[in-house]
């Protein structure tokens, strides 16, 4: 890439507990380890990545708003807000930044209430069920997407 692109990695509620929280569904890797891997990839691809996690819908929305005209791509794991937050969806649409929706677990193999997403129909793509590797795949997709712009 000739210019340095900026990517925002957003993680929603309870993802700060990765590694300890329900490893059957989410694996044993910590969020810090996932972020470290993405930062390593970013360095290799000459991309700047900012990582942000919040348990609060308001903080996530504010971070999205702050990204307007500052960020080229968003990688988001909205966690439980996937199934409930029209406000987060509206924030993403308001800033018009392309994004990929990420889920560690395969939400379609879980409880029925997890099968609906307020984001997937407006996302560039959705990655679910691939564990922490899903973040890497989403990052590489973003790199490819931005290279084609």
Swiss-Prot record:
Binding site residues for substrate: 77, 83, 90, 104-105, 114
PANTHER family, alphabetized: CATABOLIC 3-DEHYDROQUINASE
Catalytic activity of the protein: 3-dehydroquinate = 3-dehydroshikimate + H2O
Protein name: 3-dehydroquinate dehydratase
Lineage per the UniProt record: Bacteria, Pseudomonadati, Pseudomonadota, Gammaproteobacteria, Pasteurellales
Role according to the record: Catalyzes a trans-dehydration via an enolate intermediate.
Enzyme kind, highest EC tier: lyase
Organism: Haemophilus influenzae (strain 86-028NP)
UniProt record similarity statement: Belongs to the type-II 3-dehydroquinase family.
Parts forming coiled coils: none
Single Gene Ontology BP annotation: amino acid biosynthetic process
Keywords: Amino-acid biosynthesis, Aromatic amino acid biosynthesis, Lyase
């Amino acid at each position: 890439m000739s210019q340095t692109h900026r990517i925002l990695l957003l993680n929603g509620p309870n993802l700060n507990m990765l590694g300890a929280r329900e490893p059957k569904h989410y694996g044993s890797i910590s969020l810090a380890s996932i972020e470290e891997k993405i930062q390593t990839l970013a360095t290799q691809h000459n991309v700047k990545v900012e990582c942000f996690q919040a348990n609060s819908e308001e903080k996530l929305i504010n971070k999205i708003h702050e990204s307007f005209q500052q960020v080229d791509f968003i990688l988001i794991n909205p966690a439980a807000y996937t199934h409930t937050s029209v406000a987060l969806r509206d924030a993403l649409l308001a800033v018009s930044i392309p994004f990929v929706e990420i889920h560690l677990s395969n939400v379609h193999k879980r409880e029925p209430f997890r099968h609906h997403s307020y984001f997937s129909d407006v996302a560039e793509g959705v990655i679910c069920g691939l564990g922490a590797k899903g973040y890497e795949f989403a990052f590489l997709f973003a790199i490819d997407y931005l290279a084609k712009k």
